[in-house]
């Protein structure tokens, strides 16, 4: 069983912001596996489930806002008894240029509050699919930057990255993590 977590903030006003790139990606991946989200209040998230490559996949979008994402993750992880090593978090990363994707297992949170929240409840030995959103320019406040919408060219670049993640996601299901990592580089 795999747990796939897309990080973002609930609400239409955040839908296409840089901080919600995890939500955008997980919706596209779940859709590829003919799975749709429904709200599960007991887990504080939207959840979608499917079976592929002989294993159950649980997709979640926390509805707690970014800084409390761990609350949803620990609820689902505990209920389904999923190990952190079988968890994949998809999130925005300001330290990567827009549209760049990196895959890694474990490590620090890089100041990302959603990852801090998850680290606080399950540790940091989980997998991360980092989607670059770039850094703010001209002394723009970081919070304002990540909560702002993409420009049209940025959005196109990010969607191409998400398409690459989606088309190669089967490698994760086949436990070919190194091959997935190489495809993202």
Swiss-Prot record:
PROSITE patterns: PEPT_TRNA_HYDROL_1, PEPT_TRNA_HYDROL_2. InterPro entries: Pept_tRNA_hydro, Pept_tRNA_hydro_CS, Pept_tRNA_hydro_sf. One of its GO terms (molecular function) is tRNA binding. The record marks 9 as: Discriminates between blocked and unblocked aminoacyl-tRNA. The keyword Hydrolase applies. It catalyses: an N-acyl-L-alpha-aminoacyl-tRNA + H2O = an N-acyl-L-amino acid + a tRNA + H(+). Its EC number is 3.1.1.29. The record marks 92 as: Stabilizes the basic form of H active site to accept a proton. One of its GO terms (biological process) is rescue of stalled ribosome. Its main location: cytoplasm. It is an enzyme of class 3 (hydrolase). Keywords: Cytoplasm, Hydrolase, RNA-binding, tRNA-binding. Monomer. Belongs to the PTH family. NCBIfam families: pth (TIGR00447). This is Peptidyl-tRNA hydrolase. It comes from Rickettsia rickettsii (strain Sheila Smith). The gene is pth.
